[in-house]
UniProtKB/Swiss-Prot annotation:
Family the entry assigns: Belongs to the intron maturase 2 family. MatK subfamily.
Coiled coil feature spans: none
Source organism per UniProt: Oenothera parviflora (Small-flowered evening primrose)
Function recorded in the entry: Usually encoded in the trnK tRNA gene intron. Probably assists in splicing its own and other chloroplast group II introns.
Protein name: Maturase K
One Pfam short name: MatK_N
Keywords in alphabetical order: Chloroplast, mRNA processing, Plastid, RNA-binding, tRNA processing
InterPro entries according to UniProt: Domain_X, Maturase_MatK, Maturase_MatK_N
A GO biological process held by the record: RNA splicing
Length: 512
C-alpha cells in the first residue's frame, strides 16, 4: 500500500496555475484559428457563414471587451430574455469561446504529458499509462482467438454537462475559469434547438472543446477502472482508509460503500482477481473479454454499472450489457465482423503396425468486410443503386478524365487500405468492381459513349489505375508472395486515423 498514496495524490505542483487570464489573450484565439485552418474550417472570421474570408481580430476584441464587463456574464433565468453577454451573435461567440477554451484547458494536460517525459526511466515504468490504440491489432491476432466470453459495452455519455465540469475540476485548479466554463457550457447547450441530442453531435460538429471534454470523461473512467484491474492481484489485507483519500476517485463515498461492501481489500481482491481479463476501447465503445466462466464477466459488468452510476451519475441498465460466447457471436469491431471459428486439422499418425488419424480442433480468427453496410453507403453516395448495381455520377461529368479517375482510384485505395485486415477478400473485390464500373459509366456518360465501346478503347489502362499500392508494399514485406495474389491479413497502423467513417462509410472516404 506504500505506493498507492503516490498514485492517488493529485499533482500539487500545478494546482495553483491560473488559466482565467488566458481567456482574455488574443493569441489564444489566434492559435485556435490556426487549428481551425488545419481542419479547413474556423469560426473566427468576419462572416460566420463565409469561411473563406480572413481572420478578424475585431470579433475577438469585441468578445473580450464584453467578457470584461461585470454584468454581462449573468444569464437570465427566463429563456426568452436575450442574454446581454452573447447578444444576437451568441452562436458565433459560443463557437469562438469553444475554440479558445479548447486551447486553454488542454494546457494542464499537455504539461502533465511533458513532465512525464522528463522523469527518469524507472519512474516512467511505474507511471499508470494506457496502451496505444495500435495494441488493438496484436490483441486481435494473438489473444482474441484464445478467449471464450466477450461483452460489447457502449460507454454511456454524461447526460448533464455539470458532470464534465466536475471531472475537469480535479485537474484545473482555477475556480474563475471553471465558473466561466460552466456558464459557457450551459449557454452553448441551450443554443441548440434539440438539447437532448447525443454527445456525438458535438464530436461531429467541429467542436474541439467538446471532444476534449468527452475524452477527459473517458480518461477519468478508464483511469479508475484500469487501476483496479491492474492492481487487483497486488491488494493486501490492509485497511482501505488510504484508498478513500483521493477525491478524484470517491466523490460520493456513501454511495460507493454500497459498491464495495466492507472495508477490507480482500473483498475487492477476490472480486476482481482475474489474470485473463482483457479491456479494449475504440471510439465510444469498449470490449471486455475473458477466458474463464461467464460468472466473472457478470461481476465485472455490475461493477461497471455501479461505477458509472455512483461516481459519474450516469444510468446504465445491466440488462443491456450482454455476455456472449465468442464461438456463437460476431463482433462489429472497427468496421469488421470478427468472430472465432473452429477449424479442424487432421494429422496422420503412422506407427510400425498401425496408422490412424488425429482430428484436432483449432480456434481461428475470422474478419470479414460488412458488405451490406458498404453497399448501402455506396448507394447513398450515388455510386450504385440499392441492389449494388453500379451507376454513373452525373455530378462528376464536368471534371476532366484524369480527375474523375483519380477520385475513384483514391476511394478504392482507401477502402483496400482500411479493409486489408480482412481474412476473406471476396466482399472487398465486389466493392472494387462497383467503384471501377461506376467510374467507367461516368466517363462513358461524359463522352456520350457506351460502356462497352469505352472499355474497348481504354483496354487494360483503367484496370492498372485501380491496382492499389498494397501490391508494391507486399512486394517489399513478402517477396515470395509478390508473384501471386496475397490473401492474408495485413493491419496498417494508420487505419484508426480514418475510423470516422467506420459504421457509416459514406463519410469522408466517399467525399474526397
Amino acid at each position: 500500500m506504500e505506493e498507492f498514496p503516490g498514485y492517488f495524490e493529485l499533482d500539487r505542483s500545478r494546482q495553483h496555475d491560473f488559466l482565467y487570464p488566458l481567456i482574455f489573450r488574443e493569441s489564444i484565439y489566434a492559435l485556435a484559428h490556426d487549428h481551425g485552418l488545419n481542419r479547413n474550417r474556423s469560426t473566427l472570421f468576419e462572416n460566420e457563414v463565409d469561411y473563406d474570408k480572413k481572420y478578424s481580430l475585431i470579433i475577438v476584441k469585441r468578445l473580450i471587451t464584453r467578457m470584461y464587463q461585470r454584468n454581462h456574464l449573468i444569464i437570465s433565468a427566463n429563456g426568452s430574455v436575450q442574454n446581454p453577454f452573447l447578444g444576437h451573435n451568441k452562436n458565433l461567440y459560443s463557437k469562438i469561446l469553444s475554440e479558445g477554451f479548447a486551447v486553454i484547458v488542454e494546457i494542464p494536460f499537455s504539461l502533465r504529458v511533458l513532465s512525464s517525459f522528463e522523469r527518469k526511466e524507472k519512474d516512467i515504468a511505474k507511471s499508470p499509462t494506457l496502451r496505444s490504440i495500435h495494441s488493438i491489432f496484436p490483441f486481435l491476432e494473438d489473444q482474441f482467438s484464445h478467449l471464450d466470453y466477450l461483452s460489447h459495452v457502449l460507454i454511456p455519455y454524461p447526460i448533464h454537462l455539470e458532470i464534465a465540469v466536475q471531472t475537469l475540476r480535479y485537474w484545473v485548479k482555477d475556480a474563475s475559469s471553471l465558473h466561466l466554463l460552466r456558464i459557457f457550457l450551459h449557454e452553448y447547450w441551450n443554443s441548440f434547438s434539440t438539447p437532448k441530442k447525443h454527445i456525438t453531435l458535438f464530436l461531429k460538429g467541429n467542436s474541439r472543446f467538446f471532444l476534449f471534454l468527452y475524452n477527459s470523461y473517458v480518461c477519468e473512467y478508464e483511469s479508475i477502472f484500469l487501476f483496479i484491474r491492474n492492481q487487483s492481484s497486488h491488494f493486501q489485507s490492509t485497511s482501505s482508509g488510504v484508498f478513500f483519500e483521493r477525491i478524484l476517485f470517491y466523490v460520493k463515498i456513501d454511495h460507493l460503500v454500497e459498491v464495495f461492501v466492507g472495508t477490507d481489500f480482500l473483498d475487492i481482491r477476490s472480486f476482481f482477481k482475474d489474470p485473463n481479463m482483457h479491456y479494449v476501447r475504440y471510439q465510444g465503445k469498449s470490449i471486455l473479454a475473458s477466458k474463464d466462466t461467464p460468472l466473472l464477466m457478470n461481476k465485472w459488468k455490475y461493477y461497471l454499472v455501479n461505477l458509472w452510476q455512483y461516481h459519474f451519475s450516469v444510468w446504465s441498465q445491466p440488462g443491456r450489457i450482454n455476455i456472449n460466447q465468442l464461438g456463437k457471436y460476431s463482433l462489429d469491431f472497427l468496421g469488421y465482423f470478427s468472430n472465432v471459428q473452429l477449424k479442424s486439422s487432421v494429422v496422420r499418425n503412422q506407427t510400425l503396425e498401425n496408422s490412424f488419424l488425429i482430428n484436432n480442433a483449432m480456434k481461428k480468427l475470422e474478419t470479414t468486410v460488412p458488405i451490406l453496410p458498404l453497399i448501402g453507403s455506396l448507394s447513398r453516395a450515388k455510386f450504385c443503386n440499392a441492389l449494388g448495381h453500379p451507376i454513373s455520377k452525373p455530378t462528376r461529368t464536368d471534371s476532366s478524365d484524369s480527375d474523375i479517375i483519380d477520385r475513384f482510384v483514391r476511394i478504392c485505395r482507401n477502402l483496400s487500405h482500411y479493409h486489408s485486415g480482412s481474412s476473406k477478400k471476396k466482399s472487398l473485390y465486389r466493392i472494387k468492381y462497383i467503384l471501377r464500373l461506376s467510374c467507367v459509366k461516368t466517363l462513358a456518360r461524359k463522352h456520350k459513349s457506351s460502356v462497352r465501346a469505352f472499355l474497348k478503347r481504354l483496354g487494360s489502362e483503367l484496370g492498372d489505375e485501380f491496382l492499389t499500392e498494397e501490391g508494391v508494399v507486399l512486394a517489399v514485406i513478402f517477396p515470395k508472395a509478390s508473384g501471386r495474389l496475397y490473401r492474408g491479413r495485413i493491419w496498417y497502423l494508420d487505419i484508426p486515423c480514418i475510423n470516422d467513417w467506420v459504421g457509416d462509410a459514406e463519410g469522408s472516404i466517399f467525399t474526397k
